[in-house]
Amino acid sequence: MFALVLHSHLPWLAHHGRWPVGEEWLYQSWSASYLPVFDALGRLADEGHTNLLTFGITPVLAAQLDDPHCLTGMHHWLGNWQLRAHEAALIDSAAGAAGTASSVAALRELGTREHRASDWALGQFESRWRHGASPVIRPLVESGVIELLGGPLAHPFQPLLDPRMRTFSLEEGLEDAHRRWNHRPRGLWAPECAFTPGMEGDYARSGIDHFMVDGPSLRGDTALGRPVRGTDVVAFGRDLTVSYKVWSPKSGYPGHGAYRDFHTYDHDTGLKPARVTGKTTPPPDKKPYDPALAAAAVDKHVADFIEVIRARLRSESARIGRDALVVAAFDTELYGHWWHEGPMWLEKLLRALPEAGIRVGTLADARAQGYVGEPIDLPESSWGSGKDWRVWAGDQVSDLVALNAEVVSEALAHIDAMPARLRRRDPVSDQLVREALLAIASDWAFMVSKDTAAGYARDRAHKHAHAMREIAAAAAAGDDRRAAALAAAWRNADGLFPDLDARRLRHTAATAAAPAAARAQEAAR
């Protein structure tokens, strides 16, 4: 069996900057990835296809795709895209030489093409997305087209999280999925595929019976799911041999010379006019993007990937002496945002796989149909560099590790000081917990470790920590009016998860051994 898994995640960006890092990131991913990917899945659903893939979407991304501010911002962004395309179509001078992507002729053709694309996207958004993503996703879940994977609120790095906050965040994340889609997931994509022994118990108690890890977590043996010893919770591993054929840190299909170049912009319009051309071709010399050439490359790479899957299934089945499972897993944002032709490739692949005689299913299908091997002791791991915790717990982010531990400790101290039996929700405590969760998102350490908008990431972590602390200080001082005003002000920017109720954290028991923050330094070594 072949199982394709897509994981969709962005940190909370609403109200926190626009460009180059901020809401622009959300709107680019929405237009380039989420619109076309769900359009393709909708077409396949209309044709009667089911059990196509396993789709993870984090609560923090789902919140933005349903948020009124983000919906309005996305509509404006799409209109601006159309205006930029119109501007490019009418350009009368350019710096590029004839035959290059930045020539007048190439930019005019680009403008015409982008105008059609933006018009399509506006139509899709206005007809299907104006009330958010939930009405788009829910029918696909209910009809069995996709299996939905859940995740904890706000995407924390769970192995380093206090067990009470970890349990609360996971349970609230699963309930958030249920409220949005009338479906409580039984599968999970843990943030960063991160694991530490004991988390399997958290999963079992929350009704999770399978989750994703990276292939090395299973010592590279991903041909079957493996129950984590002592539980019925099955870990499925990403097959790197297959997944890296599409995308890896060093290679993959998107680098083909015919595909649109992600990094080359026309700076006057912000549009991308060039094809990759060659790995060493400088931007001024890149050739204009040619959709026909790109489409031909897509067909070639669909056929190639099918043969990769077929060969892997045969070799793994022969090795283990029974039918094997191959799991390929990717960020959804690869398809469209990073790899312009990705949605086209994805739809053609999903059509071609059954025609090629390859059995396709979801992770839930794989578990139900017995693609499960012997129990395993799962080690501390992640899908980051080194497959350990160094990205989120290394020396480069030791200050953020310490900050996260302090934020959680201070938030729990506030919660524990709450009256034991509050009859009504406490908006002050709710917002304090909301800010604490945003402060400890794993995205900030990742961005710092990878030196990707590291300043923005540090600012965000400290901003949310400051918000939590000033609310807590006012509450501790008995200044209820100031605490309420601060909570309301921060809620204007960070009003996600409106059903979050701090009283539930007050009564959350610590059900697993605490992975103390001090272990982060040891894990990094």
Report each predicted region and the residues it spans:
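Acidic (Asp/Glu)-rich catalytic clusters
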Residues: 42-49, 131-149, 178-181, 316-320
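CE4/NodB-like, metal-dependent polysaccharide N-deacetylase domain
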Residues: 166-190, 308-329
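Active-site and substrate-binding clefts of carbohydrate-active enzymes
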Residues: 1-52, 57-112, 222-525
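Aromatic- and glycine-enriched glycan-recognition loops and surfaces
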Residues: 29-40, 125-134, 168-173
